[in-house]
Curated annotation (Swiss-Prot):
Family listed: Belongs to the class-II aminoacyl-tRNA synthetase family. Type 1 subfamily.
General function of this protein: Catalyzes the attachment of L-aspartate to tRNA(Asp) in a two-step reaction: L-aspartate is first activated by ATP to form Asp-AMP and then transferred to the acceptor end of tRNA(Asp).
Domain of life where this protein originates: Bacteria
Name assigned to this protein: Aspartate--tRNA ligase
PANTHER family: ASPARTATE--TRNA LIGASE, MITOCHONDRIAL, ASPARTYL/LYSYL-TRNA SYNTHETASE
Amino acids binding ATP: 217-219, 226, 482, 534-537
Key words of the record: Aminoacyl-tRNA synthetase, ATP-binding, Cytoplasm, Ligase, Nucleotide-binding, Protein biosynthesis
Organism encoding this protein: Klebsiella pneumoniae subsp. pneumoniae (strain ATCC 700721 / MGH 78578)
InterPro entries to which the protein is assigned, alphabetical: Aa-tRNA-synt_II (IPR004364), aa-tRNA-synth_II (IPR006195), aa-tRNA-synth_II/BPL/LPL (IPR045864), Asp-tRNA-ligase_1 (IPR004524), Asp-tRNA-ligase_1_N (IPR047089), Asp/Asn-tRNA-synth_IIb (IPR002312), AspRS_core (IPR047090), GAD-like_sf (IPR004115)
Protein residues bound to L-aspartate: 171, 217, 448, 489
Catalytic activity of the protein: tRNA(Asp) + L-aspartate + ATP = L-aspartyl-tRNA(Asp) + AMP + diphosphate
Gene that encodes it: aspS
Record GO biological process: aspartyl-tRNA aminoacylation
Subcellular location(s) of the protein: Cytoplasm
GO-annotated molecular function: aspartate-tRNA ligase activity; ATP binding; nucleic acid binding
Length: 595
């Protein structure tokens, strides 16, 4: 039906007859002439109808926005005064000779001249996806997956599918459960990741595996999360962590070159401890120049418990954050930032405004200055590199609260005060994570997952001091987003059982949930390591959006609902009966519980 795409016509097509298919983006009547902007997935081209083609002109008068049409005509160059430099096709236009209205459109529920609500966009997603910016994002996503497949194939990786219906295993979030009709009372789980299957593939001898795969997590959603998401999943045998990072870094660098024409350069490597200490985050945005600076040693003897308490506590921390030009912040804004850090557990936000350093104590403004000597203030200003016009904010609490609060404040100030250089790309690797973290109930939980190997520890050493264990894990971070994460896996049964034990999984539960894995580890398991990238987040970065729903064709809301299809929906009672499931209404359930 078509010979060319609208958005691909150029001056090289001048003089050619073409047939286009697409939608009316806009119509303009200029006396005896009618112009339309015709759109398809590749872009927009101007088409005009003149009196010499009376039938086409008459039919064109019926056109309205979003009519689906076919146009045959001749490409010609625009007069110089009419060239539109803002359009890729702005140097040409199509003189229509034939017009077919394939399908008419009713008045649209979306307004192309105004910003529509996200609710409306998701309800009429098929219309929203016609917008050029949305089409471009999905084209970029397709380009990314095409590149990844080529790269992986060139490097000897095999694309192997793993099951969608599997067994529920604890991986940190709730599973989506699928009831079995054949095995009544039993449930499959949709995979949170192909983690165990890809490890089993390594045990099977497939030493380089990858898959672009859907994963599912039934968790409370945030703006950058979806209940179903896509991973670029990778696993290798007989490769060390640095070797895995090297090949994956090469892939991402080539991807950025192909999609953005940008060389990211060699990725710096930073330990988890350094990232938390300097940036208050394990995924630091290095485009932001501000850093957290430890000042506890300067404040141990001050008569101000807010500072002295954490400064003298081995589990405490006092850190300063210098904000260039921050002295201009109003009291109202300072109070707002004080309330902001309370979200992260901080009790408030002490500060020093630096107006004129040369005047000493007279050159600063601070509600805590009365507790500090001139020497201490000068030492703080020196250590933070403060200059006239700067602001210094303080965090004083346990180490986690200080890192979380000042880390979040750093990001917010970077955005609010335009201190973060949005034109830059700042990738890095973060390594050497703690293997375990406090679960808040006196136990430990795996920081990554329970199949991650410790670094340079035997099973006995791990059992004796699990809180000291460093995971042989690594995350790739770009502009403050964790785009990929992985680790060296446990390949010995004794170590795997030790980790399960530390996590409070007894031997019976180990056999019930992971018996197949423990059995597989008995038969010559090779050392293996891998990584998974979030395709959605990669696409967000490469298309310049901060909304994950902008890069997924048919996403869910933050309530895990599809407004277009109205999923989830109630199931047919007969189908539930076949599954042996009975829905208990809330009122009936409450009545039963009261009994």
């Amino acid at each position: 039906m078509r010979t060319e795409y609208c958005g691909q016509l150029r001056q090289s097509h001048v003089g050619q007859q073409v047939t286009l298919c697409g939608w009316v983006n806009r119509r303009r009547d200029l006396g005896s002439l009618i112009f339309i902007d015709m759109r398809d997935r590749e872009g927009i081209v101007q088409v005009f109808f003149d009196p010499d083609r009376a039938d086409a002109l008459k039919l064109a008068s019926e056109l309205r926005n979003e009519f689906c049409i076919q146009v045959t005509g001749t490409v010609r160059a625009r007069e110089e005064k009419n060239i539109n430099a803002d359009m890729a096709t702005g140097a040409i236009e199509v003189l229509a000779s034939d017009l077919t209205i394939i399908n008419r459109s009713e008045s649209l529920p979306l307004d192309s001249n105004h910003v529509n609500t996200e609710e409306a966009r998701l309800k009429y997603r098929y219309l929203d996806l016609r917008r050029p910016e949305m089409a471009q994002r999905l084209k970029t996503r397709a380009k990314i997956t095409s590149f990844v497949r080529r790269f992986m194939d060139d490097h000897g990786f095999l694309d192997i599918e793993t099951p969608m219906l599997t067994k529920a295993t604890p991986e940190g979030a709730r599973d989506y459960l699928v009831p079995s009709r054949v095995h009544k009372g039993k449930f499959y789980a949709l995979p949170q990741s192909p983690q165990l299957f890809k490890q089993l593939l390594m045990m099977s001898g497939f030493d380089r595996y990858y898959q672009i795969v859907k994963c599912f997590r039934d968790e409370d959603l945030r703006a950058d999360r979806q209940p179903e998401f896509t991973q670029i999943d990778v696993e290798t045998s007989f490769m060390t962590a640095p070797q895995v990072r090297e090949i994956m870094e090469a892939m991402v660098r080539q991807l950025w070159l192909e999609v953005k024409g940008v060389d990211l350069g060699e990725f710096p490597i930073m330990t988890f401890a350094e990232a938390e200490r300097r940036y208050g985050s394990d995924k630091p945005d290095l485009r932001n120049p501000m850093e957290l600076v430890d000042v506890a040693d300067l404040l141990k003897s001050v008569e101000f418990a807010v500072f002295a308490g954490p400064a003298n506590d081995p589990k405490g921390r006092v850190a300063a954050l210098r904000v260039p030009g921050g002295a201009s912040l109003t009291r109202k804004l300072i109070d707002e930032y004080g309330n902001f850090v309370k979200i992260y557990g901080a009790k408030g936000l002490a500060y020093i405004k630096v107006t004129e350093r040369a005047k000493g104590m007279d050159g600063i403004n601070s509600p805590v200055a009365k507790f500090l000597t001139a020497e201490i203030v000068e030492a703080i200003l020196d250590r933070t590199g403060a200059q006239d016009g700067d602001m210094i904010f303080f965090g004083a609490d346990n180490k986690k609260v200080v890192a979380d609060a000042l880390g979040a404040l750093r990001l917010k100030l970077g955005k609010d005060l335009s201190l973060t250089d949005e034109s830059k790309w700042a990738p890095l690797w973060v390594i050497d994570f703690p293997m375990f973290e406090d679960d808040g109930e006196g136990g430990l939980t795996a920081m990554h997952h329970p199949f991650t190997s410790p670094k340079d520890m035997t099973a006995d050493e791990l059992k004796a001091a699990p809180e000291e264990a460093v995971a042989n894990a690594y995350d790739m971070v770009i502009n403050g987003y964790e785009v990929g994460g992985g680790s060296v896996r446990i390949h010995r049964g004794e170590m795997q059982q030790t980790v399960f034990g530390i996590l409070g999984i007894n031997e019976q539960e180990q056999r019930e949930k992971f018996g197949f894995l423990l059995d597989a580890l008995k038969y010559g398991t090779p050392p293996h390591a891998g990584l998974a990238f979030g395709l959605d987040r990669l696409t967000m970065l490469l298309t310049g959006t901060d909304n994950i729903r902008d890069v997924i064709a048919f996403p869910k809301t933050t309530a895990a609902a599809c407004l277009m299809t109205e999923a989830p929906s109630f199931a047919n009672p007969a189908a539930l009966g076949e599954l042996g499931i009975q829905v208990v209404e809330k009122e009936a359930k409450a009545s039963l519980e009261n009994k």
